[in-house]
Structures are given as structure tokens and as C-alpha cells.
Amino acid sequence: MNFLELVKARYSSRNYEDRPVEAEKLDYIMECVRLAPSAVNLQPWRFRIVTDKETIAQLQTCYKRDWLSTAPCIIIACANHEESWHRRADNKDHADIDVAIAVEHICLAATEQGLATCW
């Protein structure tokens, strides 16, 4: 699949199969995230991979979407505003931009691996 085909194949899915995501696929996805660009390469992010149903159910109390409980795996993206680059002119914090780029890497890598995602 070339890049354009990959981008066309990616969409926000809210229907998931009830099977675990293979560790090799998660490792591949996280390697793609590690290589994602960020301002001054500061990578002001942390990711948490959640695969157990109990924790996913707890997360659903914070993010009330029915489809969340059907996902076999959730990757939580967290931005660290203290670690991100701040533009001198106006002190603009780039954590939101950096994490958005990294999350899109997750979505594209997952799609390439045959997995569905939701932004």
C-alpha cells in the first residue's frame, strides 16, 4: 500500500472486533510514534496502552461513548506542557500540535497493520 492508499484507508471507526491486539503490532505502532516529529524534537508526550477490560470500563466513566467499551486496546495520549517548545514571540505552547502529529502517526501505523482507530 502506498502512502496515498494508506491515508485513504484510514478513518475513525467505532466498531471493533473482540480480539486482542498483538504485541508485535503495538510495538510497531509505538516505534512509529517514537519517530514522529515534534518541535525541537522535544517529544513532549507520554502514551499509555490499556488492554484490560476493567481499566477500559473505568475510562468509559470519563469518556462516555458506548463504542469505547468494545475497543480491545486504547492508547491514551498525554501532552506535557512543561516539556514542550514555547515560541519566544508569544510563548505559544506547541504540545497540542506535537501530540496531534504523534497521534496521527498512531492512526496511520495502526491502519497499515490492519487495525481500526478513532481519533
Positions of PLM-derived features:
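Acidic, surface-exposed loops and disordered segments
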Residues: 1-119
